[in-house]
């Protein structure tokens, strides 16, 4: 029986770089991806019959749900925001950060009361779930795509819901973390049909990737 290819979608940027380092550790390198001048869209390890491609983070769960990719590696923030029908199978332990509610110190008291406040965010689904289902606070959510930190500074919102790594950008703009929504990191996701049809191969990859997280 001829073995088909497994396809892996990687979220562009640092996560993809770290993910490929992990794949290399378990004997699945992809030298084609190291060529910075390449215009290729699909990268192949012929020996292992595995194809890789890079995609914008929010698109990775979509590729996986619809079967264009069997496996995806993407941040937990994207998984929560997109809400796709996929299996989340492994926390890779890198790309760690936090989803937080941030704003000026003066906004802290607004998070304790019943007053309707405005929340600017790139993640409306996560923000809505946090405020409505966990805090039971009514808010107006404003979806933005650019620098979220700008919103409370210019009076568009009282607080923001955004990813925080070091907090330096917040501090430089007179903002601080007021509440933590949830911790985040890179995750492995799998297409539901692929998990059944290619269970042995996918399980072997997951097991290998899991072994790379032990030293982290």
Segments the model singles out, each with a brief description of its role:
Residues 1-216:
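Domain-level signature for soluble enzymes in the chorismate/prephenate branch of the shikimate pathway
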């Amino acid at each position: 029986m001829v073995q088909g290819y497994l396809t892996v979608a990687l979220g562009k940027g640092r996560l993809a770089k770290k993910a490929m380092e992990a794949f290399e550790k378990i004997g699945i390198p992809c030298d084609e991806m190291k060529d910075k001048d390449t215009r290729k869209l699909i990268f192949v390890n012929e020996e292992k019959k595995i194809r890789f491609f890079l995609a914008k983070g929010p698109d990775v769960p979509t590729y996986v749900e619809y079967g264009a990719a069997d496996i995806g590696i993407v941040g937990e923030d994207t998984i929560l925001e997109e809400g796709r029908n996929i299996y989340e199978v492994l926390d890779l332990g890198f790309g760690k950060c936090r989803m937080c509610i941030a704003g000026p110190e003066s906004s802290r008291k607004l998070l304790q009361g019943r007053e309707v406040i405005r929340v600017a965010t790139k993640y409306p689904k996560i923000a809505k779930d946090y405020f409505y289902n966990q805090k039971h606070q009514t808010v107006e959510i404003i979806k933005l795509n650019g620098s979220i930190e700008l919103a409370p500074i210019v009076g568009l919102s009282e607080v923001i819901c955004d990813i925080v790594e070091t907090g330096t950008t917040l501090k430089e703009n007179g903002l601080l973390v007021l509440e933590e929504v949830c911790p985040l990191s890179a995750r492995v996701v799998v297409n539901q049909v692929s998990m059944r049809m290619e269970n042995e191969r996918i399980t072997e990859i997951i097991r290998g990737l899991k072994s790379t997280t032990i030293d982290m």
